[in-house]
A protein has these predicted regions:
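Short, glycine-rich nucleotide/cofactor-binding loops
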Residues: 9-16, 104-107
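Short beta-strand segments
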Residues: 10, 36-38, 94-97, 128-130, ...
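Short acidic, Gly/Ser-rich segments with clustered Asp/Glu that frequently serve as metal-coordination loops
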Residues: 13-21, 206
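Alpha-helix C-terminal capping segments
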Residues: 80-86, 114-125
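Charged helix-capping and loop-helix junction motifs
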Residues: 107-114
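Glycine-rich phosphate/pyrophosphate-binding loops
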Residues: 120-142
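C-terminal accessory domains and tails appended to enzymatic cores
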Residues: 143-145, 164-261
C-alpha cells in the first residue's frame, strides 16, 4: 500500500489569492493537497484566533478542493486538522504570501507565519513562503507566471522535508524570495531584530498604514533576512524555533532581592 503525504496549504491573502493557487500547483505532485484559507485578506493578523462563529464553505480552486473559512490563518490550521482532516498533516505550507515577511516585526505580525507557528506548536513541520514585492501596491497585479521561481523553491524545499524531515532544532522555515529574480542565489539567514519605522500616515481624520515598501525596512546587519532581500537581492531561508524561554539566572537574583528569599 502506498501512503501519500498530506500537505495542508494555508495563507493570509485569502482564498482567491494567486499565491495560494501557485503554491497548490507547485506542490500537487508531492502528495494530497488540502487547502484551507480565510475568505478574505488577513494580512498582519499574526496568530490571532477567532472567538466568534467560523463559517466553512467548500469551494474549488482550479481543480483543487478547498475550504474557505470566515476566520484567521491560525483558525485555518485548527479547522483543517480537527474538523476536515481530523488528523495532523505531514507538513503545512503557508503562502505564497504576496509581500515580504522580513525581520522580527513581520514574523510576529504575519498571518502567513502565524499559521506556520500554529502548526509548529502542534509538532507539524511548517514552511512559510513569501514573494517580496518591493511595492505592495503592485500586489493585485502579480501573475502566476511571475511566481515561477517561488513555486520552484517551494516545491524543492517541501519535497526535501517530506523525505528527510525538518533540519534539527528547526520548527519553521521562513523563505523570502525577491521579486523578478534573474538568477537563483540562496542565503541562510537569521531574523533581523529591527523594528518598523513610522508606518502610519494621516487619512480620513485618522491614521492608516502606508503602502508597504521594501526600501522602508530599517537597515539590518549582514546575515539577516532583511539584508539578504533588501541589499543583496537573494533568496533568504530563515530557520525559526518557537521557544519563548529566557535565561532564568538573573531572574533568580531579582526574586531573591525583591522577595527576600
Amino acid at each position: 500500500m502506498i501512503f501519500m503525504s498530506t500537505i495542508l496549504i494555508v495563507n493570509d491573502d485569502g482564498i482567491n489569492s494567486v499565491g495560494l493557487l501557485a503554491l497548490s500547483q507547485a506542490l500537487k505532485e508531492l502528495g494530497e493537497i488540502v487547502i484551507v484559507a480565510p475568505e478574505c485578506e488577513c494580512s498582519g493578523i499574526g496568530k490571532a484566533l477567532s472567538i466568534g462563529l467560523i463559517h466553512v464553505s467548500s469551494v474549488e480552486i482550479n481543480g483543487f478542493k478547498a475550504y474557505s473559512i470566515s476566520g484567521t490563518p491560525a483558525d485555518a490550521y485548527f479547522i483543517a486538522t480537527n474538523k476536515i482532516l481530523k488528523r495532523k498533516p505531514d507538513i503545512v505550507a503557508a503562502g505564497i504570501n504576496l509581500g515580504p515577511n522580513l525581520g522580527l516585526e513581520d514574523v510576529l505580525n504575519s498571518g502567513t507565519i502565524g499559521a506556520a507557528l500554529e502548526a509548529a506548536i502542534h509538532g507539524v513541520p511548517a514552511v512559510a513562503i513569501s514573494y517580496c514585492i518591493r511595492d505592495i501596491r503592485r500586489k493585485n497585479y502579480v501573475s502566476i507566471d511571475e511566481l515561477k521561481v517561488a513555486m520552484d523553491v517551494s516545491r524543492r524545499v517541501v519535497k526535501y522535508i517530506l523525505r528527510n524531515g525538518m533540519p534539527n532544532n528547526v520548527q519553521i522555515l521562513s523563505i523570502n524570495i525577491p521579486e523578478k529574480l534573474s538568477d537563483v542565489r540562496v542565503k541562510i539567514t537569521r531574523v533581523a531584530h529591527v523594528g518598523y519605522c513610522d508606518i502610519h500616515c494621516e487619512a480620513d481624520n485618522g491614521y492608516r498604514i502606508v503602502p508597504w515598501l521594501i526600501d522602508n525596512y530599517r537597515d539590518a546587519e549582514p546575515g539577516t533576512d532583511v539584508y539578504a532581500v533588501k541589499c543583496e537581492n537573494v533568496i533568504s531561508i530563515t530557520p525559526i524555533r518557537i521557544s519563548l524561554n529566557g535565561d532564568c539566572k538573573d531572574v533568580e537574583l531579582l526574586v531573591k532581592d525583591v522577595f527576600n528569599t
